[in-house]
Amino acid sequence: MTKIKADPDGPEAQADACCGERTYHELLVNLNPIAQPLASRRLTRKLYKCIKKAVKQKQIRRGVKEVQKFINKGEKGIMVLAGDTLPIEVYCHLPVMCEDRNLPYVYIPSKTDLGAAAGSKRPTCVIMVKPHEEYQEAYDECLEEVQALPPPM
């Protein structure tokens, strides 16, 4: 028995090529009901850039357990949550913790894009970006826009 090699020009390869990147509006279809305040497309891009800079400086907290631990320790930063995480019980307590401690938080549409921005191949449902002087200007710009978003109902 021999293995059959996949045709690189076959229909499956073409389907993968056309569907590799999903647009912002396509990602909005999968949002949770609690994903408020939601970042605009422009703010989402700025947050991804800020996250990439923070990863280089190792000023990032990734994952529910780690982020929750450092919120309880009193660390400050911008909380970025993925709006397409299911089940929502995994991280629905984090916005309440942020509001109690006056930490800014925002939802973005995709956990896979959030994980990729953090330099991981795995999807990530929550990231905390801490301030650092190397990317302070980008951080302050994101912080200002996140704080200007309307509060959730």
UniProtKB/Swiss-Prot annotation:
Record-linked Pfam families: Ribosomal_L7Ae
GO molecular function list: box H/ACA snoRNA binding; telomerase RNA binding
Cross-link type Glycyl lysine isopeptide (Lys-Gly) (interchain with G-Cter in SUMO1), residue numbers: K5
A Gene Ontology biological process term: snRNA pseudouridine synthesis
Glycyl lysine isopeptide (Lys-Gly) (interchain with G-Cter in SUMO) crosslink site(s): K5
Gene3D superfamilies for the chain: 3.30.1330.30
One Gene Ontology CC term in the entry: telomerase holoenzyme complex
Record's subcellular location: Nucleus, Nucleolus; Nucleus, Cajal body
Alphabetically ordered keywords of this record: Isopeptide bond, Nucleus, Ribonucleoprotein, Ribosome biogenesis, RNA-binding, rRNA processing, Ubl conjugation
Cross-linked residues, Glycyl lysine isopeptide (Lys-Gly) (interchain with G-Cter in SUMO2): K3, K5
Signal sequence bounds: none
InterPro entries cross-referenced by the UniProt entry: eL8/uL1-like, H/ACA_rnp_Nhp2-like, Ribosomal_eL30-like_sf, Ribosomal_eL8/eL30/eS12/Gad45, Ribosomal_eL8/Nhp2
Principal place of residence: nucleus
Keyword Disulfide bond: no
Protein's job: Required for ribosome biogenesis and telomere maintenance. Part of the H/ACA small nucleolar ribonucleoprotein (H/ACA snoRNP) complex, which catalyzes pseudouridylation of rRNA. This involves the isomerization of uridine such that the ribose is subsequently attached to C5, instead of the normal N1. Each rRNA can contain up to 100 pseudouridine ('psi') residues, which may serve to stabilize the conformation of rRNAs. May also be required for correct processing or intranuclear trafficking of TERC, the RNA component of the telomerase reverse transcriptase (TERT) holoenzyme.
Subunit structure: Part of the H/ACA small nucleolar ribonucleoprotein (H/ACA snoRNP) complex, which contains NHP2/NOLA2, GAR1/NOLA1, NOP10/NOLA3, and DKC1/NOLA4, which is presumed to be the catalytic subunit. The complex contains a stable core formed by binding of one or two NOP10-DKC1 heterodimers to NHP2; GAR1 subsequently binds to this core via DKC1. The complex binds a box H/ACA small nucleolar RNA (snoRNA), which may target the specific site of modification within the RNA substrate. During assembly, the complex contains NAF1 instead of GAR1/NOLA1.
Family: Belongs to the eukaryotic ribosomal protein eL8 family.
Name of the featured protein: H/ACA ribonucleoprotein complex subunit 2
Source organism of this protein record: Bos taurus (Bovine)
Gene name tied to this protein: NHP2
